[in-house]
Amino acid sequence: MNRIERILEGFDPVSNGLDEDFVLTKLTGMKGCGCKVPRNVLLQLLQTFKTDLVINNDEVDIGLDSCVIPLRHPGLRLVQTTDFFYPLIDDPYIMGRVTCANVLSDLYAMGVSECDNMLMLLAVAIDLNEKQRDIVVPLFIQGFKDAADEAGTKIRGGQTVRCPWLLLGGVATSVAHESEIIKVDQAVPGDVLILTKPIGGQVAVNSYEWIKKKNGKIEELNLEIPKIEKAFKQVCEQMSRLNRNAAKLLHKYDAHSSTDVTGFGLLGHAENLARVQKQPMEFIIEKLPIIEYMDEIADKMIAKGGEGFKLYQGTSAETSGGLLIAMSEENAKKYIAELSSLDNAPAWIIGKVTAKTTDSSIARILPDAVRISVPSHI
């Protein structure tokens, strides 16, 4: 059974030797990249390092969970990224694939499509009994390994501990020539912004949880369960899909800037990308590709006085989301056509880059941004 077939079939605890009521996501109160410390808080906390932490230097570019380090060998760089989070789906195998894809995504965002080594990080929840542990952990490891194999890399170590919560993650390392790494600060006025996966993952995961918990939310908002289930399967597919093809094409089509969209949401990562440009730029987001029906859920939540997971503000968390890329419009159209063919999934031009007269770069979503409803393709 391949990845998509498994997602479409759904996870049955009983056929995997577990009790009928086993739910992996009960082992944590947080979900996926939604566990991230808010971006503004994290930036403040990082000031503790001050002179120890080099940010936006010509030689050492450091992100929030990745780094590019010059080696003593001319032209070579050590590219390294780490990530870990809590489970957000109940199939341990698919969760393993999602975890691996998410760890690799920061390499791919820099155009580095070859990973030389991975480490796996795993905290086994103490609430798992021995039988559950001996079924769940191997399934997770197999999923992580299969995704690593698909990425053309190997897992050569890691750390496994016991913990009050189930934690999943890893480290990805690549030694790359400087020419293999996309410069993130080269966006120019006239560039367009590309997004390679739709947003709405947090809405899909949480609304699916409402079905399982039977907490009254489905009835309160008058939601359609089949539509939520369909969206959830689509999210599982895109979270477990590697951004590797997207990374390879960054070089072919001369990308000027790139990042991946994860826990800080589309706008949060667009702001990060705008902030590191050499010249003051404005990243203007004009379109929001949203997984089908997730906008309707957000609308109904907002109508009840909620925030709709801040989907329209662009800060709704994504897990193993797509790449956000700046490149010329001419190349963007070719990039999207080839990527869509390789991944059998759509991508979009969602905005533009303009010059800014003030000293600081910003990103913003237009108040009347067009919402694109993206149907499932699996």
UniProtKB/Swiss-Prot annotation:
Mg(2+) binds at D65, D106, D260. Keywords: ATP-binding, Kinase, Magnesium, Metal-binding, Nucleotide-binding, Selenium, Transferase. Its EC number is 2.7.9.3. GO terms for biological process: selenocysteine biosynthetic process. The record marks K36 as: Important for catalytic activity. It catalyses: hydrogenselenide + ATP + H2O = selenophosphate + AMP + phosphate + 2 H(+). CDD domains: SelD. Binds 1 Mg(2+) ion per monomer. GO terms for cellular component: cytoplasm. ATP binds at K36, G63, L64, D65, D83, D106, G158, Q159, T160. One of its GO terms (molecular function) is selenide, water dikinase activity. It comes from the Eukaryota. Its cofactor is Mg(2+). It is an enzyme of class 2 (transferase). InterPro entries: PurM-like_C_dom, PurM-like_C_sf, PurM-like_N, PurM-like_N_sf, SPS/SelD. The active site is at C33. Synthesizes selenophosphate from selenide and ATP. Homodimer. Belongs to the selenophosphate synthase 1 family. Class I subfamily. PANTHER family: INACTIVE SELENIDE, WATER DIKINASE-LIKE PROTEIN-RELATED, SELENIDE, WATER DIKINASE. This is Probable selenide, water dikinase. It comes from Caenorhabditis elegans.
